[in-house]
Amino acid sequence: MPPPPEDEAIAHKGHFYGVYLLCSQSLDSRYRAKCYVGFTVNPKRRIKQHNRGCDFGGAKKTSKKGPWQMVMIVHGFPNNISALQFEWAWQQPTLSTRLKIFPDLKRKKPKETHFDYNFRILNRMLSVGPWHRLALTIRWLETDYERAFDLPIPCHMEIVSGKVSISASQRKLEEATGTAPPVAWAHECHLCMQSIEQPERSRLGCTNPTCRLTCHMLCLASYLLGDEPGQYIPIGGECLLCETRLSWSALLQRKRLQLGVPEEMQDNEEEDLSDDGPDVDSDVEVQEFSD
């Protein structure tokens, strides 16, 4: 497989969950500029399936209504369930209990395009829980559609441009994201000063490879939560040794990769990335988590 272009991000196979927005480029005025929201673990393969039709793994709602462009994708979800919850709410903003505080989402505004309406829904979603605490990446895939959000998004989220490639290579991922483990570990937790039992599973450190920060997972989580009463999952914070900015989701992602534990592959993801195996979007009802 040829290496990805230099401006293309690399995500690890089995750990990527994305919710994307398609826009139709159909010459038929009935379908042109219509939008579709879906879930994928492999963006490149998914857009090919949509454009080939439902007989090749595409969705019924997009079949024969293209060609389609995948104009943006939101990723960084901790698991497929979280991503599917997000997809469902984006598809059904009037049914989502979390979006009822935004009555303006009930319908498209006059002269508002389908893309603008879906972008407005996304903007509101990123400002409410549980999504506003996730370290999500909003990735523009087509520069013609790029625009600024009306409501500011949380500062721990990223807005980037460029394609994303799925790789099974641990070396490629470490080179692209700097997820290599620290040069050395301490024997005791820097926070509670107790020894760490089963370090392979319960130990976390800094993302700076030259930093020797060594902590119990729960100790570091409590430290990063700081003065956030009522919260159980941290967003991030500064390393207590080197002051590197830490992302909790990035720390957990690195731990999974070090353990070699793949996440569940949604919709029977095939081993061969070139294979057109099923990658079906969730047309079935997905229930929201209760508060």
From Swiss-Prot:
One of its GO terms (biological process) is double-strand break repair via homologous recombination. It comes from the Eukaryota. Its main location: nucleus. Residues 15-101 form the GIY-YIG domain. Residues 264-291 have a biased composition (Acidic residues). The keyword Hydrolase applies. A zinc finger (SLX1-type) spans 189-242. The keyword DNA damage applies. Its cofactor is a divalent metal cation. One of its GO terms (cellular component) is Slx1-Slx4 complex. Gene3D superfamilies: GIY-YIG endonuclease (3.40.1440.10), Zinc/RING finger domain, C3HC4 (zinc finger) (3.30.40.10). Belongs to the SLX1 family. Catalytic subunit of a heterodimeric structure-specific endonuclease that resolves DNA secondary structures generated during DNA repair and recombination. Has endonuclease activity towards branched DNA substrates, introducing single-strand cuts in duplex DNA close to junctions with ss-DNA. This is Structure-specific endonuclease subunit SLX1 homolog. It comes from Drosophila pseudoobscura pseudoobscura (Fruit fly). The gene is slx1.
